[in-house]
């Protein structure tokens, strides 16, 4: 047999090479031979939504800050039965004693007028707060006021000058109203639980005062010290809370408060008075979700 020519050898090699034909998978037709749709080997994109971020709004917080108060004039009633004294001084001018304006480190931590807050939010809107306001309520000396009632068993209506030897009356180590507040929260900017968000708070509540009494009536001092649950008080407040760096925040609050004090110790008797004030406070706090 004669040898293959080069052209014939090339043709024979070409005919013996296997040919692979790639057929595209038609996912729209059923595999008749198997009786079921063909298997789609491609990767499917999940239609399930990603898990939601925490939106319960539950949050715990605590803060410390300082306050200043503007007091309305007040009437103060004095009762000293064994001395025959039962009189009221009217429209008395009152002042506070901030302390922190002298410098935050000029006094010990609890000497200035301070605020202490603990609370929690149940959800994005509602929360509760325990608020202790260490405020100072001091009768201004060297003022002349109207007095009505009896003194030494006799009528004593007329004007009286409140000099140091007549009256020195103050809740200087704290009028100390304690409030149990309900809080409503509105988010103004930012996301919950993140740094850089701002919220507005409305608060209202009630409670009782725990004053530290210190006074002198007609030159005789009282047995000074703390008294507990000496009346009742209510408040309403608006505040802005700025969460600068998680979990820390600053809060600025303006509140109106009313307190009724009774059974305040004086020499051989008691006194009672009402406190009406507007109070501004600023606080530094921490919160945890």
Predicted regions and their residues:
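Outer-membrane beta-barrel translocator domains and adjoining extracellular loop/strand segments
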Residues: 74-80, 141-147, 212-221, 263-269
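Bacterial N-terminal signal peptides
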Residues: 9-18
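Gram-negative (and chloroplast) outer-membrane scaffold detector with strong preference
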Residues: 58, 117-216, 285-289
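Residues that define the transmembrane beta-barrel architecture of outer-membrane proteins
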Residues: 58-60, 110-114, 172-178, 198, ...
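Short glycine/proline- and aromatic-enriched beta-strand/turn motifs that initiate or cap beta-hairpins
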Residues: 19-120, 211-213, 281-289
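Predominantly the C-terminal beta-signal and adjacent terminal strand-loop region
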Residues: 74-77, 82-88, 239-289
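Extracellular loop and loop/strand-boundary signature of outer-membrane beta-barrel proteins
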Residues: 49-50, 101-104, 164-170, 218-227, ...
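Flexible, solvent-exposed coil segments and beta strand-coil junctions
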Residues: 91-99, 156-164, 213-221, 262-266
């Amino acid at each position: 047999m004669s040898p293959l020519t080069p052209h014939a050898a090339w043709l024979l090699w070409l005919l013996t090479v296997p040919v692979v034909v790639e057929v595209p998978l038609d996912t729209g037709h059923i595999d008749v031979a198997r009786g079921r749709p063909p298997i789609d080997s491609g990767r499917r994109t999940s239609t399930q939504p990603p898990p939601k971020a925490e939106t319960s709004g539950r949050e715990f917080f605590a803060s410390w800050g300082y306050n200043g108060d503007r007091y309305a004039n007040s009437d103060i009633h004095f009762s000293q039965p064994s001395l025959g004294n039962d009189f009221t001084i009217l429209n008395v001018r009152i002042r506070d004693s901030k302390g922190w304006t002298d410098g935050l480190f000029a006094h010990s931590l609890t000497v200035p007028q301070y605020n202490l807050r603990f609370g929690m939010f149940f959800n994005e809107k509602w929360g509760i707060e325990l608020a202790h306001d260490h405020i100072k309520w001091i009768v201004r000396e060297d003022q002349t006021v109207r007095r009505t009632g009896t003194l030494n068993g006799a009528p004593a209506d007329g004007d009286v000058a409140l000099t140091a030897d007549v009256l020195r009356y103050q809740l200087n180590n704290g009028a100390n109203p304690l409030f149990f507040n309900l809080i409503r929260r509105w988010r103004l900017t930012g996301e919950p639980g993140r740094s850089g968000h701002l919220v507005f708070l409305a608060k209202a509540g009630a409670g009782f005062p725990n004053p530290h009494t210190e006074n002198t009536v007609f030159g005789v001092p009282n047995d000074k010290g703390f008294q507990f649950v000496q009346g009742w008080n209510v408040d309403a407040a608006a505040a802005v809370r700025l969460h600068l760096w998680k979990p820390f925040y600053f809060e600025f609050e303006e509140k109106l408060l009313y307190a009724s004090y009774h059974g305040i110790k004086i020499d051989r008797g008691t006194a009672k008075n009402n406190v009406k004030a507007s109070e501004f406070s600023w606080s530094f706090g921490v919160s945890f979700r």
